[in-house]
Amino acid sequence: APTPSLKLVAIAVAGSYLAVYWYHFLFHLGEKDPAAVNLVESMRGNDIEIGRLTHPKRMPLRLSWRDINHHIHILGQPGVGKSVLLKNIYAHQIMQGEGLLMLDLKADYKVREDFKSLCKMADREQDFVLIDLSHPESSYGYNPLLLGNATELKDKIIGAIEWSEPYYKKVSERTLLTVLRGLVYLRDQKGMVSNLEDLLVAISTVQGVTLLAEQVDEASIRADIQSLAAGFSKDFAKDLESLKTELTLLVKAEFGSIFKSDKTLDVFSAIMEKKVILVNLDGQTYNESAKKFGRLLLADLRSASGAIVTNIPEQERPRFAVLVDEFSDIVSTEDMAKTFVGFLNRCRGSGIGVVIAHQSLGDFKDPTVKAQIMDSTETMFSFVQKDPETCDILASVVGTKESYEKTKQTKEWIFGDDNTGMGTKKLVHEFIYHPNVFRNLNVGEAIYAAKKPSRFGTVHVKMIEIPHVPQEQTKVKAPCISDMKTLALNDELNKRRTEYTSAIRNSTTKIEDLEI
């Protein structure tokens, strides 16, 4: 039987547990959601805890601001952990009070709610800026002509378009530069801000060019615009057709009102004020138009980066992160990649760090583009890969290690081969991570490699839960086909063709009475 002293100890321990329980129950009512508290606590340090390394050492993996400032490249098939890794980065950036811009081609609802909840937890709701192509009525505005000189704006617009004919590209560049010199003059000297619709009007007709010339007071700029108007022939208008079409597709799109909104994003000011910007591009709905929108924003970042380096002392430059999901869809040609690589190489000095994510290196058709992107990013995470070429390249990127290859000499024996005790031992170099390792990674598991100093490992990415703020949902009624009339233009056209044919055969019917 237990002694009285043991009974007293047991009673004391039980009483302590009960006291602690009731203390928390009575005095911690109304506190924040435990998940929110845990998230806030985990984001207190300056470094981002991404997860835990399982090879070569078991230890936490943390990324510093230097890692982000020297750019991060994330690869992985859908559903294997890319979004979770990005979530760790943007959650830390928001909770630390730093600036952020994320281009989300998927326009994921969960990401939008993550940003709203994180800003609320960090008491930064006034810093949140949402540009949403799916909901232009509630979106922040964006004007590509707000920041930059005429040459910068020309390069921004030309770079957003995929060109197949160099001739039409050159004609468009020359025309844009002339017109934009006038628009920039009006913006900077008269405070008259133009938008893409104004630009489209100015390059579409002689009347538009002439109207612009009348507004400009500076003699040399006005003379150049008048010269453009004088040579505005039918052939010249045809040469500009591609440019006009591309601008029309943006201005007249369902999200075209974003370009004309009074509440407009100023990228330079947003960086300096550490704003939290989410751009929902909705590539599934708008596809090519969404990609052009994303390219315009990236070009604005390049202009803002240059303005920061030129005008802001180094100690006053904020830490601003740029996250680009489905990167390869936005930067899809060699010219675009060269421009973006130039931005990567220069934006470190302005305090901008870039994180790009996409599926595999096979997304880049041009090998030059592939090499440029790999060389310009210092840290790489690769989740499971199925493309053999990508696996081979990534294994080479991580590198090799020295090991000894041993061989044994055998001889035939009655009961099979037997060792003779002789053999060789040769020093060889083998992959640290064989290509097959990249093919067989589990969900949430990635190979990590970084330069300067050289680091590598296998990491299990940390899953974080962001408690969402309850919001009233607006249900959108889907149109019912049975309640609508079908236009059926083709059926109507065939019907009229039949009537016309019958009229030809019937001499009593007057053909002019029929509409074709």
Give residue spans per PLM region:
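Hydrophobic alpha-helical transmembrane segments
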Residues: 2-14
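Conserved ATP-driven motor cores of ASCE-family P-loop NTPases powering translocation/secretion/packaging/pilus
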Residues: 146, 151, 234, 341-447, ...
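A short C-terminal helix-loop "cap" of Rossmann-like NAD(P)-dependent dehydrogenase/epimerase domains
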Residues: 459-461
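P-loop NTPase motor domains
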Residues: 27-36, 43, 53-57, 65-352, ...
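Short loop or secondary-structure boundary microenvironments that flank
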Residues: 105, 283, 384-387, 463
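Transmembrane alpha-helices and immediately adjacent membrane-cytoplasm interface residues
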Residues: 11-30
